[in-house]
Swiss-Prot record:
Gene3D superfamilies: PSTPO5379-like, PSTPO5379-like domain. It comes from Cupriavidus necator (strain ATCC 17699 / DSM 428 / KCTC 22496 / NCIMB 10442 / H16 / Stanier 337). Its EC number is 4.2.1.-. This is Putative hydro-lyase H16_B1759. It comes from the Bacteria. Signal peptide: none annotated. Coiled coil: none annotated.
Length: 270
């Protein structure tokens, strides 16, 4: 009886993920935090083939910020993480980068794969994946509660360079009640493939963040009395590398607008 209930829950979650992707394919644009709870979400970056090795090495050298979940070969658009999905259309919002600068945001990236048929795509673990376990433990995830995007910040922590790529770590922030910080660290730490435990707790100035009310990406969130800002490595870090390194061309997800997979978050729980 219990097994059948769990299977029904799993099927419902997969169906929710597929429905979300279909909605994005049809043109819906929204941040994905809280969508299809229990399913793994992923950051995305696609680069021309001659930059792929640099990025793979960059990710290998910086696994906290860039944990690779899948690599889609040059010219392909499908991933083993989501049956029938198309990486060009099934993310709600994409960013297009030219010579290290943000050129535009689009809801359908299909023409970009026509323009650059040799794109190699990397799917990177996302901390949205462990937000459901945080909520199940009674820890409010503020940006979900308030219906906003997660705040993200560039930091003074430099990633280890690789080939032509270099840049700083980007972090996401969630305010956590002081008495629950240890729980948040423990819960997220069981998900190392999606950034794992925090990289910093407390004073944002230690990361070079001057003002929490002015995130570099996403939306500012309220911090209540008795709460402490907790910072996790973020999969927007590759976008910082694109900017710092002047990559000629790249396509990424827009911050907070993830690729929702068919993989349960429990798959990455250790």
């Amino acid at each position: 009886m219990q097994d059948s209930a769990l299977e029904r829950t799993r099927i419902a979650a997969v169906n929710a993920a597929r429905a979300a992707r279909a909605s994005y394919r049809a043109g819906t644009v929204q941040p994905t935090a809280g969508i299809a709870p229990g399913m793994t979400q992923a950051n995305m970056i696609a680069l021309p083939r001659d930059w792929a090795w640099d990025f793979l090495l960059y990710a290998q050298r910086n696994p906290k910020a860039c944990p690779v979940l899948d690599v889609i070969e040059a010219g392909a658009q499908q991933t083993v993480l989501a049956q029938g999905a198309d990486i060009r259309t099934d993310i709600p919002l994409y960013r297009v980068w030219r010579d290290g600068k943000l050129a535009e945001e689009v809801a359908d990236a299909t023409p970009l794969w026509t323009e650059h048929p040799d794109l190699v795509t990397f799917l990177i673990g996302c901390s949205f994946t462990f937000e459901t376990p945080l909520q199940e433990a009674g820890i409010e995830v503020r940006h979900i509660a308030d219906g906003s995007n997660v705040p993200m910040y560039r930091t003074n922590r430099q990633c280890r360079p690789a080939g032509r790529l270099h840049g700083e770590m980007v972090v996401s922030m969630r305010p956590i009640p002081a008495h629950r910080v240890a729980d948040a660290v423990s819960i997220s730490g069981r998900f190392p493939s999606v950034h794992g435990s925090p990289v910093h707790v407390g004073d944002p100035a230690a990361l070079g963040i001057a003002d929490l009310a002015r995130p570099d990406f996403g939306d500012a969130v309220r911090i209540e009395p008795g709460e402490i800002p907790v910072f996790w490595a973020c999969g927007v870090t590759p976008q910082a590398a694109v900017m710092a390194s002047g990559v000629p061309f790249a396509v990424t997800h827009a911050p907070g607008h993830m690729f929702i997979t068919d993989v349960p978050d429990s798959t990455y729980h250790v």
